[in-house]
């Protein structure tokens, strides 16, 4: 709570004003699932940051806990969704809480049928705003997909 003095209100006199609900740096919670500690130490990033009930998830890719890229596209896509599920869960959310999602695809048109099939198996349909972007490359050679999202805990 922040106090602001100095408001002179006609008929009332000098009034102190309190501002409620302001967000401070202490309201931010860094979310790191147990299985991602090595990645966070290696890459120096937070898988998610939670402010209030809103969870901002960094891009998740299909790699093993040992940071190896999974070569098979379908298995890589499944692993990316599983990594996102772990991040959401560590932040108190689930797929149904996602309100916005952006996916980045290398060789998008070649892999889109497989990606959509996997997405439809694991992610609820029509529950969020989704933007799909084709890119030339991602952080590591062999990565085909990165998924980032924003979720609001219900």
Residue ranges of model-derived segments:
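Acidic, Ala/Val/Gly-enriched low-complexity intrinsically disordered segments
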Residues: 5-7, 12-15
